[in-house]
Amino acid sequence: MKKSIVSVLLLAITFGFFGKSKAQEKDSLYEARKLKIDEINFVSGYYTQEGEHSSIGGGKGDEALTNISNSIQVRLLKNSQKYEHRLDVAVAVDHHTSASTKLINNVPDGSPTNIYSGKISAKTAASSGTSGVTGASSKFVGWRIYPSINYFAKNLERNTTYGIGAYYSREFDYQSIGGELSFVKASQDNNAEFSVKAMAFFDQRLEILPVELRPVNTGVNNKKADDDEDEHEGNDDNYKLWNKNSYSVNFAYSQIINPRLQVSLLADFAFQDGLLSIPYNRVYFTNNTVSSEKLPMQRMKIPLGMRLNYFLGETFIFRTYYRYFFDDWGIKAHTAQLEIPIKISPFVSLSPFYRYHHQTSNDYFKPYGQHNPGEKYYSSDYDLSSFNSQNIGLNLHYLPLESKIFKSVDFRYSFYKRSEGLSAHNLTFAITFK
């Protein structure tokens, strides 16, 4: 699912490379305009993957997954003599099917006994009528909805922009509320720009354990009230409800060096606390016991990056990107990307792209059956393992210049391959209406 979201962001960056019109000169007799719809963006994506390291199966099992996503964004503009106001309202819906999801309520073939002592109940969330953050029906499993709203006010005299945004996301076992504040300052000649954005997300996740790890004396099986003083709380369905908070500050500085060369420097600082593990991910130990994934309750992440765009005449643009990432869980990663938009005609451009990623393993990752029972933290999620990945694809951008309805149309395809075996295909279609 994350990769389909990344594709949407990449499309947004690609839009307008060859379709930007020259900025109009300011008129001293400028008149304020009423609120109007500036454009409507529709994006639809299809993502499918295959692999054999299911995290729900403890690092072993079918990872086949299909995700279909659709989003629509309406952009409203209103100009006054001093300010330009912009309001973006969007809603997106995803639906995915996963081969390993059924293993939450079913014991994998050949699975050993659980790490808990005592009798184990095989009563499932579906049979107890509990399957959501607030009691949602099991028919919503696989669905995700995430609306957002963003407002920006640009001071035309000072060339500064202030922004505020709100986000919401909901799945059958997870919900998130977030917000952001942003500030952008551009030079008077628009050759340099500095931006900063602060974001915070407050998430809640139900502690839905694999079926064989649900003791009879807790949670859903005996409807026990939550009257303890631990860091989580119960809900009407008697699943434990855990919190996760995420905070980040993003800095960016861009500079036009000359008419052909533009450079951007990027730095992000992120901190998370709360439940950072996924309760229904299994971990198998060397003594033939099994437990759910357990990771530290805090994490700090710092990505540092740079973009360099070089315009070779009116036909080619070389867009390069590099990022170095590290966190306090032991991961260090390098990512490099090259994209070359090629102007075929005034209406059409093609953009082949290639992305390479290398990362070291998380301190708490081990493959299936290799964790020791005495370890404090453990995970067999291969997203936290050491691997190399490659992503290659092509974007087709079409500008119907004479159309009174369509502003741009994009098709984007990519193929993703990881050294540990995971592979994926991603197809995205985007259209912007005037």
Where are the language model's segments positioned?
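Transmembrane beta-strands of outer-membrane beta-barrel pores
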Residues: 44-50, 91-97, 143, 166-172, ...
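Outer membrane beta-barrel transmembrane domains
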Residues: 120-128, 135, 267-270, 275-309, ...
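Repeated loop/turn-to-beta-strand initiation elements of outer-membrane beta-barrel proteins
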Residues: 82-87, 157-162, 190-194, 260-263, ...
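Residues on the lipid-exposed face of transmembrane beta-strands in outer-membrane beta-barrel proteins
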Residues: 72-76, 147-153, 181-185, 251-255, ...
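Outer-membrane beta-barrel translocator/channel fold
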Residues: 54-56, 61, 90-147, 193-260, ...
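Membrane-embedded beta-strand positions of outer-membrane beta-barrel proteins
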Residues: 40-44, 87-91, 162-164, 194-198, ...
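Residues that define the transmembrane beta-barrel architecture of outer-membrane proteins
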Residues: 64-70, 141-147, 175-179, 243-247, ...
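Outer-membrane beta-barrel translocator domains and adjoining extracellular loop/strand segments
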Residues: 52-58, 100-106, 174-182, 207-214, ...
